Structure formats: C-alpha cells, structure tokens
C-alpha cells in the first residue's frame, strides 16, 4: 500500500483469490507479472471452467504463469528480489507479493479464558446468528469460522446486534451468499458448485452458455466468459451458478434472488431482461434447461 510507482516486474507467490486478483490488477497497470502457482491451475479452489478462462486470459495478456511450481524462498537482491523454486529454478523481479493465505488474529487475547471455542485454525466458532459458544459473546468477520467476505461480515454484525437486543432475526444461510473474484474478467459464484454436483454431494443438472453467443457481448467485443447454471434434478429449482464476465459481480444478483426464493429455471426464464444485455444470457441459460413435459 506504500508503493509510489507500479512495480517493473511483480512476482506473485500463490494463485488463490488474492494472488490472482493482484496479478490481474498489476498486469492491467502495465507491470510485468510472474505468477507462481503450486497447483496445476490457478484458482484451485474455484470453478474449474472459470479458472481455465482466467488462466488463458492471463497468459494471453502477457503474464507468465508457472504452474506446479512451489516457491521455497524469496530474498532481496541488489536490484529487487529473487524467488527460488523447489526445483532449483529462480525468478528475478523488482517486487514480490506473498499471497499464501492468512490466519486470524485471535491468539492471546483471552478468548479461551472467556470460554469462547476456537477451531484448530484459530477461528472463532459461531452459529448462524453470529453467536459464539458463550451466549453473550458474538463474533463477526474474518475472525469467525464463516465465509471471509465483507458482505458476510456486515450481515453477521447486523444479525448479532439485532439478536442481542432481542429482535427477530433470520439466521444467515451461507449457501445463498454470492462471492466474486475481481480479476479481468470477474468470476461470480453463488450456491452449490459443479464439484459438489459431480462428486454426488447434491443432485443437479448443469448448463453452460458461452458469453460469446450473447448479442451485447458481441457489440462490446467480449469473447471470454460464460454463464453456468445448476438446477435440482428433481424440481428444476435453481441451486447455484457461476458467471465469468466483465462486472460479473453485478450480474450475479438475479441468481442470488432465484436461489433465495427457490425459483425454478422455468420461472427464471420467464423474466424479461433488457435486450441486448449481458444479463440476457442468464435467462437464455435457464430457458435451455427446460424439461419438456
């Protein structure tokens, strides 16, 4: 945060959400970027199709992506930094960003003495109204064991206050929480994932519609991205979705509402989006999931 100029060559260690976002941002600002990933693909915890699109865009835009490469050390040099990989290779750059995860700042502040239960990772255990194991103590935000998102933290804070004051509250349902990765293009997700459907955690049908088929996308030159919907095999209810697109964070809201109100794909398809618009791909995908009968 104290940089006075953009790095000439930024080495990013870690290809999770933070690493991918900063790598994308600095490449867009004109920095040479090398992304060191220990996994086979960037964003290993995200939708595989979405991660594939982002990695392809990264490489096409001139970013160097070193997959299956584990960084052993990063040291300062006379001209910048040198990252040494597990196989002995070295990468030289002007700056390095370490994006290899975070830990909650909950140690030695008296939580255990107060009877507040922690997870093995040090996060505070909370229920769906943000209350800890001690009835009069609440926790909100990244220190809790809920989703580490600003929207969730804000909702936890509101829920905790209302609940503590005796007001009626709706318990937080993390399955309905949308999240977004601010790369270019963005990745927005909500609900169940394709991995959970594929491994049998929940039954569902999957449909993916490339954004390149969208009229508005053609008008503005967007070729990368897609809309992917997940629906219950039994009822046709929308249970999840992934959008990879410019401003996907703005496009995901219809799917959030569909999941929150348990709309079917047919009900979603009956909505009238503006034509032409990127949001039209959502109803197009829903329409394609209709089962005749």
Q: What do the PLM-derived regions correspond to, one by one?
A:
Residues 1-7, 90-166:
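FAD-site-proximal beta/loop scaffold in flavoenzymes
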Residues 78, 120, 233-235:
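Short acidic-glycine loop/turn motifs at beta-strand connectors
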Residues 32, 64, 90, 117, ...:
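Conserved beta-strand segments of alpha/beta enzyme cores
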Residues 165-166, 177, 182-293:
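Flexible, glycine-rich terminal cap/loop adjacent to redox cofactors
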Residues 36, 84, 118, 126, ...:
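Hydrophobic alpha-helical segments, especially N-terminal targeting/anchoring helices
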Residues 48, 77, 96, 138, ...:
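Residue-level structural signal for beta-strand termini and adjacent loop
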Residues 1-2, 7-11, 17-78, 82, ...:
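Rossmann-like dinucleotide-binding cores of NAD(P)H-dependent redox enzymes
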Residues 20-21, 26, 43, 105-108, ...:
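Glycine/Thr-rich phosphate-binding loops of Rossmann-like dinucleotide-binding domains
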């Amino acid at each position: 945060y104290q940089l006075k100029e953009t790095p000439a060559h930024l080495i990013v260690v870690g290809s999770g959400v933070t690493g991918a976002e900063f790598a994308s941002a600095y490449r867009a600002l004109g920095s040479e970027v090398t992304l060191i990933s220990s996994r086979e693909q960037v964003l290993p915890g995200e939708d595989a199709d979405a991660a594939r699109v982002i990695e392809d865009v990264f490489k096409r835009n001139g970013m160097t992506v070193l997959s299956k490469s584990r960084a052993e050390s990063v040291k300062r040099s006379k001209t910048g930094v040198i990252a040494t990989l597990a196989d002995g290779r070295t990468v030289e750059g002007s700056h390095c960003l370490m994006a290899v995860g975070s830990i909650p700042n909950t140690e030695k502040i008296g939580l255990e003495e107060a009877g507040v239960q922690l997870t093995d990772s040090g996060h505070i255990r909370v229920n769906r109204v943000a209350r800890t194991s001690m009835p009069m103590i609440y926790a909100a935000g990244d220190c809790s064991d809920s989703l580490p998102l600003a929207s969730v933290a804000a909702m936890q804070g509101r829920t905790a206050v209302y609940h503590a004051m005796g007001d009626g509250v709706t318990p937080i349902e993390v399955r309905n929480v949308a999240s977004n990765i601010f790369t270019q293009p963005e990745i927005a997700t909500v609900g169940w994932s394709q991995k959970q459907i594929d491994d049998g955690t929940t039954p569902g049908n999957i449909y993916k519609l490339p954004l390149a088929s969208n009229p508005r996308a053609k008008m503005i030159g967007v070729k990368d991205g897609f809309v992917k919907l997940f629906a219950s095999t039994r009822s046709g209810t929308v249970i999840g979705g992934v959008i990879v697109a410019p401003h996907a964070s703005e496009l995901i809201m219809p799917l959030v509402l569909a999941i929150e109100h348990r709309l079917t794909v047919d009900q979603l398809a009956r909505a009238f989006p503006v034509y032409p618009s990127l949001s039209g791909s959502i109803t197009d995908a829903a329409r394609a999931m209709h089962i005749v009968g």
